[in-house]
Curated annotation (Swiss-Prot):
Its cofactor is Zn(2+). Its EC number is 6.1.1.5. Catalyzes the attachment of isoleucine to tRNA(Ile). As IleRS can inadvertently accommodate and process structurally similar amino acids such as valine, to avoid such errors it has two additional distinct tRNA(Ile)-dependent editing activities. One activity is designated as 'pretransfer' editing and involves the hydrolysis of activated Val-AMP. The other activity is designated 'posttransfer' editing and involves deacylation of mischarged Val-tRNA(Ile). Pfam families: Anticodon_1 (PF08264), DUF5915 (PF19302), tRNA-synt_1 (PF00133). IleRS has two distinct active sites: one for aminoacylation and one for editing. The misactivated valine is translocated from the active site to the editing site, which sterically excludes the correctly activated isoleucine. The single editing site contains two valyl binding pockets, one specific for each substrate (Val-AMP or Val-tRNA(Ile)). This is Isoleucine--tRNA ligase. It comes from the Bacteria. Monomer. Keywords: Aminoacyl-tRNA synthetase, ATP-binding, Cytoplasm, Ligase, Metal-binding, Nucleotide-binding, Protein biosynthesis, Zinc. Its main location: cytoplasm. It is found in: Cytoplasm. GO terms for biological process: isoleucyl-tRNA aminoacylation. ATP binds at residue 597.
Length: 1044
C-alpha cells in the first residue's frame, strides 16, 4: 500500500511536484467549491503595488494570509481570497518619471498628462506575473484571476461614492493649510504618510538675525534654522512670560533685545555688554520692525512685521525670539489669528523661488540657504551663524527632505469622528493585543484631519466640479450622475479623460473639475466597498461580508491601511472595517539594517525557497518574533536550522513508519481502535487529542505563536520519546498485538499531525498525506476537515506523569553531559530525590523507562538528599536584612557555622535558634541559602523540587556493557554505509581482539538482538573495517547479509 520513501530527500523538488499536483487537479478550486453555501469567513487582502518584486517583507503577511484562510476552510467556512493591486499614486508616478527621465509638474504637463497616464497604466502591472509565480511558490492559495485593481472603473466609481457620502455628511472640506510637501513629487502628503517615511539626523544652518525695530536704532535678535523662509518673514514671536533684556553691545556699538537666559550663550564675558532694561515678552507685543527683505512690504498694512506672543517660544535654544513665515504650522496659525496678511508662498510646485523673490528666483529653497546667508552678511544683518543638528522628515517615496508649506487641500474631518474611531478600535481584536491601546490607540487619540488630495496626475480624481463664476461645488458620486449632469458618455474616470468634461452653470460660468486626485490611501481604505463595486452591485448582500473577519499586514499599516480602513468604515457605517488583525513586524537583514538591493545584504527570496523549501521559510517566519509585530533579523542559517531541526525530523518520523510498514505489510483501515493498553500509545494519543484542542482554541484566537509552540513541542515528543522508546516494538519479528498497536498509533499520530500542520506547511503535509491516505479518503489533505479532539481519549493525568518523567530524564542526561559521562556508558545507580509523594509514585511506576533512558542498573527513589550531599548554609540577606538590623553580620557568621545535622533539621521544617547577646532569632529554610556538596563518587544536580544523583564509579562489568553499546552503534553505522535494509539479518565478523571477545562473551544475545545479527564469527580476513570504541580501543569488524 505504501510507497517507499527515499532516504535522500530534496524538499524544494517535492514542493514543485506538489504544486503541479495542486494545479493539475485544481485542488484550490475544489477546496472553494466544496465550501460553497457554507458560512462565509470574510478576508480582505491589502493591495500591494506591482511596480516592484515581492521580498521578505511581503512573505510574512502572505504566509499569515495563507495560514488563516486554509485553517478556516478546513473548519468548514467559505473563504474567498481575491488578490488586489494598488495601481494609482505616487509610487507609480515616480517610477514613470524615472523611466521617462522627466521630473516635476511642468515637465509632465509638457510631456502630456494623457500620455503620462498611459505610461502609468502600462507600467503599473509590470511584475504581476512574477508576483503570481512567487506567491504561488510560497504556497499561498489566492484567486489571482478574479483580482481587483484600484484603476478599474468599477473600483474608482465606488471610491467616488465613498467620497460623496463623506462629503454629504460634512466630513470633507477644502482649506488652505500648512502641510508636509514632497518637492520631488510636487504634492502634499498626509501626516500619517510622513510617519511612513524616515526622520534623519541632519545639519542645518542656525542663524541669529538682526531685525531693526521701526523708527529706533535697536534690533531684535531672532533665531531660525530655516534661512530659506526669511524672504517671506511676516512676523516675530516672543514668549509672553519669558524675561528679555535690552542690552548695549560695547564691541558692536549696537542695542539688542534678547532672551535673558540666552545671554550666556551669546556673550561669554558679561563685561562686553551693558543691560539697559529688562521686561517680559508681553511688554513688546505689537511693536513694529523692519523686515530683512523688502519683497512683501505691502503686507504691513495687513498686520505684517509686528511682534506676537506664542506659547511654543522657549529659551532652550536660540535667542528666545523666533521669526515667523507662513511655512510652518504654528507660524501659519499665528499669522492667521493675528493678521490679515496674504498667505504668501513665492515658490512653485517644485519648491523653487518664483520671481516675487527676485534675488533667489529659480533656486530650490534649501539650495538658497547659503546665498541668503551671504546676502544677510552683506547687509550687516547676520549676528551669528552656527550649525544645528536635528531630526527632519524625509519623503517615504523619494527619500528627499520634505518642505512644510501652505497649500490648498481637501481634508477628511477626523476631529469630528475621533470619538467614534476610538469606539471602533474597541471592536477590533489586535494580535498582538498591546497595539489596541498602544501604537494604534494612541495614534487615534492624536489623529488630525487627513489631507486626501494630491496635486498629481495618475490617481482617482476628486469628483468635485466647481462653478467658475460663483464657486458653487457639485460632488459627484457615480458615472451615471456625471453623465446626467454633463450630457456626455463616461467610460474612463481618470484625470486626463474627465478633466475635459465640463458643463454650463445655471448662474453663468462653467463647472470645471477641481484639479487634484485622491490620496491612494483613500482608495485602499475604500477597498471593502470598491472591490465589490458597492453600492452599485449586490448592495443587499454587502453587509453579510462586512466587516472583514480577518486581515493581516505589517506594523507600518497601523498608520496606513489599518488606519484608513478604520476611518472610512467608521465615517460610513460607524463601525470598524475588520474584526481581527494579525500585525507583523519588519524583516531586517542579519546585521539589523533595512534590506537593500544596493547593499546586497540579503539573499534573493526565491533562492532561499529553491535551497531550503517554502515550508522551511514559512515556518521560520511564523516561529519568529515578526508575527508578534517585533522586528526579525533574517538569516539563511535560521531557515536552514528550521529545515534541520523541524522539517527533516518530521520526514524522519514519516520515513521510519513507512520503512517498517512496508516490511511488515501493515495496512491501516478507517476503524483503528484507539483504546490501547501500552502506556506509550495511551500517552501519545492523549497528547494528540490535547494538541487538537489547543490548536483549535489558539488559531481561533489568531494566536499563531502559541500554536506553533505547541506543534513543535508535540513533534519533539513524537520523535524523541514515542518513536525512540517504541523502536523495538517495530523491530521485533513477530506481528503480535503490541506491534500492530504501535503501527496503528504511529499512523494515527502522523496523519493527524499532518492535518494539524497543513495550514502552516502545506507542501510537506500534502506529500506525506498522499502516501498515508487510504483509497476512500479525500484527494488532498487540504480538502479535509481540521481535526477535532476526541475528549474521552484525553488523559491529563497520564500526560503530566509522562512529562514529569521526561523532565527527570532530561535533568539526568544533562548531569551526565556536564560530567562527560556518555549515555552509552552504563552507571550503577541513579538517585532521585523528591518530597512529593505523587512524584515518588510516578517514579516508582515508570522506573523501567528511567533506567533505560539514563542507562542505569538501579534506581533509588528518596525523599531527602542525605545519601547524596552534605550541606553548608549562608545567610539569605534579602530575607533577613529587614529583621536583624545591626545584628545581621553576627547572625550570618553563626549560620555559616551550622553543621550538616543542623541544616537537615531546618530542611525538615524545624527552626534553629541563634542567640546574639540578649536577642534570639529563629532561623527557617527561607532564611538560608543552601550549598550542596556531593559525596564521593556521586554527581548531583538539583532543579525545582527534584534532586538527581548519579553513582559515577564504573566497574569492569559496566565498562564492558558500555563498550557493547558502542559496538552496536558501530555495526548500525556499517549497515547504513552498506545500504542494508532495516529488516536484513546479518553475520557479524570481528577480529581476534581480547576486549572484543570479552564483550561478546557477556553481551552476545543483546548485541545480536539490537543489530539483527544471526551469527558472530571471529574472522580477521572479513573483519576489515577499523572502528574505535571509547575513543581509544581500535578494533576491526565486518558484516554480510545472512543468505541462508
Amino acid at each position: 500500500m505504501f510507497k517507499k520513501v527515499e532516504s535522500k530527500v530534496n524538499f524544494p523538488k517535492i514542493e514543485e511536484k506538489v504544486l503541479k499536483f495542486w494545479n493539475d487537479n485544481k485542488i484550490f478550486e475544489k477546496s472553494m467549491q466544496q465550501r460553497e453555501g457554507c458560512e462565509e469567513f470574510t478576508f480582505y487582502d491589502g493591495p500591494p503595488f506591482a511596480t516592484g518584486l515581492p521580498h521578505f517583507g511581503h512573505f510574512v503577511p502572505n504566509t499569515i494570509k495563507d495560514i488563516i484562510p486554509r485553517y478556516k476552510t478546513m473548519k468548514g467556512k467559505h473563504v474567498k481570497r481575491y488578490f488586489g493591486w494598488d495601481t494609482h499614486g505616487l509610487p507609480v508616478e515616480y517610477e514613470v518619471e524615472k523611466s521617462l527621465q522627466i521630473s516635476g509638474r511642468y515637465e509632465i504637463e509638457k510631456y502630456g498628462v494623457d500620455k503620462f497616464n498611459e505610461e502609468c497604466k502600462n507600467i503599473v502591472l509590470r511584475y504581476t506575473k512574477e508576483w503570481q509565480k512567487t506567491i504561488s511558490r510560497l504556497g499561498r492559495w489566492v484567486d489571482f484571476e478574479h483580482n481587483y485593481k484600484t484603476m478599474d472603473t468599477t473600483f474608482m466609481e465606488s471610491v467616488w461614492w465613498v467620497f460623496q457620502t463623506l462629503y454629504n455628511k460634512g466630513l470633507i472640506y477644502e482649506s488652505y493649510y500648512v502641510l508636509p510637501y514632497s518637492p520631488k513629487l510636487a504634492t502634499p502628503l498626509s501626516n500619517f504618510e510622513v510617519n511612513l517615511g524616515e526622520y534623519k539626523e541632519v545639519h542645518d544652518p542656525s542663524l541669529t538675525i538682526k531685525f531693526k525695530i521701526k523708527d529706533k536704532n535697536e534690533y531684535l535678535l531672532a533665531w531660525t534654522t530655516t534661512p530659506w523662509t526669511l524672504p517671506t518673514n511676516l512676523g516675530i514671536a516672543v514668549g509672553r512670560d519669558i524675561d528679555y533684556s535690552k542690552i548695549f553691545d560695547k564691541e558692536k556699538n549696537e542695542t539688542f533685545i534678547i532672551g535673558t537666559k540666552r545671554l550666556n550663550h551669546y556673550y561669554k564675558d558679561d563685561k562686553t555688554y551693558t543691560v539697559i532694561e529688562q521686561f517680559k515678552g508681553e511688554h513688546i507685543k505689537g511693536i513694529e520692525y523692519e523686515p530683512v527683505f523688502d519683497y512683501f512690504l505691502s503686507q504691513r498694512n495687513k498686520g505684517a512685521f509686528r511682534i506676537h506672543t506664542a506659547e511654543y517660544v522657549t529659551t532652550d535654544d536660540g535667542t528666545g525670539i523666533v521669526h515667523i513665515a507662513p511655512f510652518g504650522e504654528e507660524d501659519y496659525n499665528i499669522l492667521k489669528k493675528n493678521t490679515k496678511t496674504d498667505m504668501i508662498t513665492p515658490i512653485d510646485a517644485e519648491c523653487r523661488f518664483t520671481n516675487e523673490v527676485k534675488d533667489f528666483e529659480g533656486l530650490f529653497v534649501k539650495d538658497a540657504d547659503n546665498k541668503i546667508i551671504e546676502k544677510l552678511k552683506s547687509m550687516n544683518l547676520l549676528f551669528k551663524r552656527e550649525n544645528f543638528l536635528h531630526r527632519y522628515p524625509f519623503c517615504y517615496r523619494t527619500n528627499s527632505p520634505l518642505i512644510y508649506r501652505p497649500i490648498s487641500s481637501w481634508f477628511v474631518n477626523i476631529e469630528a469622528i475621533k470619538e467614534k474611531l476610538i469606539k471602533s478600535n474597541e471592536q477590533i481584536n489586535w494580535i498582538p493585543s498591546h497595539l489596541k491601546k498602544g501604537r494604534f490607540g494612541k495614534w487615534l487619540e492624536n489623529a488630525r484631519d487627513w489631507a486626501i488630495s494630491r496635486n498629481r496626475f495618475w490617481g482617482n480624481p476628486i469628483p468635485v466640479w466647481i462653478c467658475s463664476k460663483t464657486g458653487n461645488k457639485i460632488c459627484i458620486g457615480s458615472k451615471e450622475e456625471l453623465e446626467r449632469l454633463s450630457g456626455q458618455k463616461v467610460n474612463d474616470l481618470h484625470k486626463d479623460k474627465i478633466d475635459k468634461i465640463t458643463w454650463p452653470s445655471q448662474y453663468g460660468g462653467t463647472y470645471v473639475r477641481t484639479s487634484e486626485v485622491l490620496d491612494c490611501w483613500f482608495e485602499s481604505g475604500s477597498m471593502p466597498y470598491a472591490s465589490k463595486h458597492y453600492p452599485f452591485k449586490d448592495k443587499d448582500k454587502f453587509h453579510d461580508i462586512f466587516p472583514a473577519d480577518f486581515i493581516a499586514e505589517g506594523l507600518d499599516q497601523t498608520r496606513g491601511w489599518f488606519y484608513t480602513l478604520t476611518i472610512l468604515g467608521t465615517a460610513l457605517f460607524e463601525q470598524t472595517a475588520f474584526k481581527n488583525v494579525i500585525v507583523n513586524g519588519l524583516v531586517l537583514s542579519s546585521d539589523g539594517r533595512k534590506m537593500s538591493k544596493s547593499l546586497r545584504n540579503y539573499t534573493d527570496p526565491m533562492e532561499v525557497i529553491n535551497t531550503f523549501g517554502a515550508d522551511a521559510l514559512r515556518l521560520y517566519l511564523v516561529m519568529s518574533p515578526v508575527v508578534r509585530a517585533d522586528d526579525l533579523k533574517y538569516s539563511d542559517d535560521g531557515v536552514k536550522d528550521v529545515l534541520k531541526n523541524i522539517i527533516i525530523p518530521i520526514w524522519n518520523a514519516y520515513s521510519f513508519f513507512i520503512t517498517y510498514a512496508i516490511i511488515d505489510k501493515f495496512e491501516p483501515n478507517s476503524n483503528i481502535v484507539l483504546y490501547k493498553t501500552n502506556i506509550l500509545d495511551k500517552w501519545i494519543i492523549s497528547e494528540i487529542e490535547s494538541l487538537k484542542k489547543t490548536l483549535n482554541e489558539e488559531i481561533d484566537k489568531y494566536n499563531l505563536t502559541k500554536s506553533i509552540e505547541e506543534l513543535l513541542a508535540f513533534i519533539d515528543k513524537l520523535n524523541n520519546w514515542y518513536i525512540r522508546r517504541s523502536r523495538r516494538r517495530f523491530w521485533k519479528s513477530e506481528n503480535d498485538n503490541d506491534k500492530i498497536d504501535a503501527y496503528e498509533t504511529l499512523y494515527y499520530a502522523l496523519k493527524n499531525l499532518m492535518l494539524m500542520l497543513a495550514p502552516f506547511i502545506p507542501f510537506l503535509t500534502e506529500e506525506i498525506y498522499q502516501n498515508l491516505k487510504t483509497k476512500d479518503e479525500k484527494e488532498s489533505i487540504h480538502l479535509n476537515e481540521y481535526p477535532q479532539e476526541i475528549k474521552e481519549l484525553i488523559n491529563i493525568d497520564l500526560e503530566e506523569k509522562m512529562n514529569f518523567i521526561r523532565k527527570v530524564v532530561s535533568i539526568a542526561r544533562a548531569l551526565r553531559a556536564s560530567h562527560n559521562i556518555k549515555i552509552r556508558k552504563p552507571i550503577s545507580t541513579i538517585y532521585i530525590v523528591t518530597k512529593d509523594q505523587k512524584e515518588q509514585q510516578i517514579l516508582s511506576e515508570m522506573k523501567e523507562i528511567i533506567l533505560e533512558e539514563i542507562n542505569s542498573e538501579e534506581i533509588k527513589i528518596k525523599s531527602n538528599e542525605e545519601e547524596l550531599v552534605t550541606y553548608k548554609a549562608k545567610a539569605n540577606f534579602r530575607e533577613l536584612g529587614s529583621k536583624l538590623g545591626t545584628n545581621m553580620k553576627a547572625v550570618a557568621l553563626e549560620i555559616m557555622k551550622l553543621n550538616n545535622e543542623d541544616i537537615l533539621k531546618i530542611i525538615n521544617g524545624n527552626k534553629h535558634t541563634i542567640k546574639i547577646k540578649d536577642n534570639t532569632y529563629d532561623i527557617t529554610l527561607k532564611d538560608i541559602i543552601l550549598e550542596r556538596h556531593e559525596k564521593e563518587n556521586l554527581k548531583v544536580i538539583n532543579e525545582d523540587s527534584v534532586t538527581i544523583g548519579l553513582d559515577a564509579l564504573i566497574t569492569e562489568e559496566l565498562y564492558l556493557k558500555g563498550l557493547s553499546r558502542e559496538l552496536i552503534r558501530k555495526v548500525q553505522n556499517l549497515r547504513k554505509e552498506n545500504n542494508f535494509n532495516v529488516s536484513d539479518r546479518i553475520i557479524l565478523y570481528i577480529d581476534n581482539n581480547e576486549i572484543l571477545k570479552k564483550i561478546i562473551s557477556q553481551f552476545e544475545s543483546y548485541i545480536k538482538n539490537e543489530t539483527l545479527t544471526l551469527k558472530i564469527e571471529i574472522n580477521n580476513e572479513k573483519a576489515l573495517t577499523k572502528v574505535e570504541l571509547d575513543d581509544e580501543i581500535l578494533i576491526k569488524i565486518g558484516i554480510e547479509k545472512w543468505s541462508n
